[in-house]
């Protein structure tokens, strides 16, 4: 219905996909993203201009990646980490949105897929270590091999909240990196500590105030 309406109005389309999106990818998540890309290419090309953005992890103050792991790391003294050598090139949300805005009238980006990454490559373990450093806490991180990572996914998938699923595990079998496309300039280590540490410090301060009976 949306594509039909875009055809009628000839709206400029900016579609958010994912790095490694492919109908033949190992995970259903990446397959669905790939199918969506194909649908846009097959149905919009003749009617309006589109750009498909394919980012790695997108991070920022309210992100679901660093904030989720910071919450888990505060709770768990021992943290078994699946697929610790999987690679990512996280891109800062401000860099990505500015690039998307610049592309709206840029004809060189019309009807193209564009990978969008940050300037540096990190392993999953490095990102977890950076999260710990940002929170100024220490935890025992246990890197899991392929077999144990898959087992963890199967167990966690049946638990409430589904913190880690088999489909997540399959997605992690492909490194979320790219040597082409747009590269943001913001480094994870320069941005993430600002909001993780500030958030943690504020909540810790509020707890101390409550314990002391102060409002």
Q: What spans do the regions from the language model cover?
A:
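Conserved beta-loop-beta element that borders a ligand/cofactor-binding pocket
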Residues: 38-62, 71
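SDR active-site strand-loop-helix element
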Residues: 13-19, 53-55
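Conserved active-site helix of classical SDR/Rossmann-fold NAD(P)-dependent CH-OH oxidoreductases
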Residues: 34-41, 98
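A short C-terminal helix-loop "cap" of Rossmann-like NAD(P)-dependent dehydrogenase/epimerase domains
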Residues: 69-83
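Single conserved hydrophobic/aromatic residue that forms the stacking wall/gate
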Residues: 1-11
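Short-chain dehydrogenase/reductase
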Residues: 1, 26-37, 59, 63, ...
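Substrate-positioning beta->alpha
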Residues: 64-65, 83-105, 112
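Mid/C-terminal beta-alpha module of Rossmann-like enzyme folds, strongest
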Residues: 103-163, 175-215
């Amino acid at each position: 219905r949306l594509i039909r309406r875009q055809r009628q109005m000839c709206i400029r389309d900016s579609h958010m996909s994912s790095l490694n999106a492919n109908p033949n990818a190992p995970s259903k998540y990446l397959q669905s993203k790939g199918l969506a890309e194909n649908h846009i290419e097959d149905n919009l090309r003749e009617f309006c201009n589109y750009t498909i953005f394919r980012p790695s992890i997108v991070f920022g103050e309210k992100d679901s990646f660093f904030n989720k792991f910071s919450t888990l790391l505060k709770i768990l003294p021992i943290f078994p980490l699946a697929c610790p050598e999987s690679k990512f090139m996280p891109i800062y949300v401000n860099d990505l949105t500015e690039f998307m805005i610049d592309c709206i009238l840029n004809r060189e980006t019309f009807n193209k897929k564009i990978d969008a990454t940050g300037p540096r490559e990190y392993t999953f373990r490095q990102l977890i270590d950076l999260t710990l450093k940002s929170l100024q806490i220490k935890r025992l991180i246990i890197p899991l091999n392929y077999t144990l990572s898959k087992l963890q996914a199967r167990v966690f998938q049946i638990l409430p909240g589904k913190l880690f699923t088999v489909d997540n595990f399959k997605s992690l079998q492909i490194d979320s990196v790219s040597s082409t496309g747009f590269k943001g300039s913001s480094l994870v280590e320069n941005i993430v500590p600002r909001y993780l540490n500030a958030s943690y410090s504020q909540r810790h301060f509020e707890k101390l105030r409550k314990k002391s009976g102060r409002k």
